[in-house]
């Protein structure tokens, strides 16, 4: 599936790149940090005991991301958690290219404003290498999910991976793309 018009990628090329070159003194466009991928992870603890749960959430994650998720499995057995090696524990999707830009656009402009008492995302959630992690409390805030079809509310993690070397560069990149950080 190809996308002819990707508004966030256009904004990146026309506004973000010149602004970042000016602010950080890059000599070449290719030095400017860019988005590499977005990983959406859904940890389903009860997935090891209930296979239907994995299937239901896989359909929801596929609707949200527009791409089939991969089932994540336990790497080793842990007796205290009643987990054996190879049991399904969650789902993940890796978005790149146009799908990644469209998901980020939807996240910034539609999903985050729907959160209750939303005053901006935490500016301290960077990992030290220019990647940003964000937790979402439920799947209902996405427009693709019908509230009456949801059997169980499930949160998810969204990790935005950039080519930025520092958190400062990554924060500026995401802010210029429209990410609403807390003041």
Swiss-Prot record:
The gene is rplE. This is Large ribosomal subunit protein uL5. One of its GO terms (biological process) is translation. Gene3D superfamilies: 3.30.1440.10. This is one of the proteins that bind and probably mediate the attachment of the 5S RNA into the large ribosomal subunit, where it forms part of the central protuberance. In the 70S ribosome it contacts protein S13 of the 30S subunit (bridge B1b), connecting the 2 subunits; this bridge is implicated in subunit movement. Contacts the P site tRNA; the 5S rRNA and some of its associated proteins might help stabilize positioning of ribosome-bound tRNAs. GO terms for cellular component: ribonucleoprotein complex; ribosome. Belongs to the universal ribosomal protein uL5 family. Part of the 50S ribosomal subunit; part of the 5S rRNA/L5/L18/L25 subcomplex. Contacts the 5S rRNA and the P site tRNA. Forms a bridge to the 30S subunit in the 70S ribosome. GO terms for molecular function: rRNA binding; structural constituent of ribosome; tRNA binding. Pfam families: Ribosomal_L5, Ribosomal_L5_C. The keyword Signal does not apply. Keywords: Ribonucleoprotein, Ribosomal protein, RNA-binding, rRNA-binding, tRNA-binding. It comes from Kosmotoga olearia (strain ATCC BAA-1733 / DSM 21960 / TBF 19.5.1). It comes from the Bacteria.
């Amino acid at each position: 599936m190809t996308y002819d018009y990707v508004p966030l990628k256009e904004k990146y090329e026309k506004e973000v790149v010149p602004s970042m070159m000016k602010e950080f003194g890059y000599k070449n466009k290719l030095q400017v940090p860019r988005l590499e991928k977005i990983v959406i992870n859904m940890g389903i603890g009860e997935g090891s005991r209930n296979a239907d749960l994995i299937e239901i959430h896989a359909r929801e994650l596929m609707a949200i991301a527009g791409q089939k998720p991969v089932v994540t499995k336990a790497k080793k057995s842990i007796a205290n958690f009643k987990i054996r090696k190879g049991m399904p524990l969650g789902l993940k999707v890796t978005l790149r290219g146009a799908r990644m830009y469209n998901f980020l656009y939807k996240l910034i402009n539609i999903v985050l404003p729907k959160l209750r008492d939303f005053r901006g995302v935490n500016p301290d959630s960077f990992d030290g290498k220019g990647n940003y992690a964000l937790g979402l409390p439920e799947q209902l805030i996405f427009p693709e999910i019908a509230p009456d079809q949801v059997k169980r509310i499930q949160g998810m993690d969204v990790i935005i991976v950039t080519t930025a070397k520092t958190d400062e560069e990554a924060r500026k990149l995401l802010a210029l793309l429209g990410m609403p950080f807390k003041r």
